[in-house]
């Protein structure tokens, strides 16, 4: 995209701030995963941070770093570039979670594959990845979900799973 999507603005807030505010409505504890070179960023400094500690690039480094800090916790993972995400969609994901699976994820309306960046990852799956790197041949959370036992659910509001990928994406119709 050419710019840090977390810092894109939606009205008076960044997408990261909007996502954090939304998660606060549903969760007790929220962490923001960052790369080491983002440590001094003033927007991110407002939040509880998890610094990526693994060689994986992208979201997988953050997911594994979070698991390393709290290895017995399931992790609800949300990308900050989903400005249409709403509380009802997060509640649906949490209500339909099944810890007997490796993860619970929405069926992506774009490609009918598990949506890895609005999903709940169970601790057994993440422990398995850390103890056996063969479980993660790529750095892709989606690939991990596709080779795991995942409860895939259909979002009641599939539009909530849209992300913003282009500088020209129209965010004007989103309520802040």
Regions found by a protein language model. Give the residues of each.
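Nucleotide and nucleotide-moiety/phosphate-recognizing core
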Residues: 1-138, 143-162, 167-171, 175
């Amino acid at each position: 995209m050419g710019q840090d999507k977390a810092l894109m603005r939606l009205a008076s807030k960044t997408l990261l701030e909007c996502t954090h505010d939304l998660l606060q409505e549903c969760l007790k504890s929220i962490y923001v995963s960052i790369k080491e070179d983002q440590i001094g960023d003033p927007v991110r400094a407002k939040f509880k941070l998890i610094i990526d500690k693994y060689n994986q690039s992208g979201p997988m480094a953050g997911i594994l770093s979070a698991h390393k800090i709290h290895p017995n916790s399931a992790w609800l993972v949300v990308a900050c570039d989903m400005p249409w995400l709403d509380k009802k969609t997060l509640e649906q994901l949490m209500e339909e979670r099944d810890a007997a699976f490796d993860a619970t994820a929405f069926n992506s309306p774009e490609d009918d594959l598990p949506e890895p960046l609005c999903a709940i990852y169970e601790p057994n799956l993440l422990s398995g990845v850390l103890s056996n790197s063969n479980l993660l041949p790529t750095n892709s959370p989606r690939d991990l979900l596709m080779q795991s036992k995942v409860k895939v659910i259909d979002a009641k509001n599939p539009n909530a799973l849209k992300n913003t990928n282009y500088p020209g994406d129209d965010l004007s119709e989103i309520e802040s």
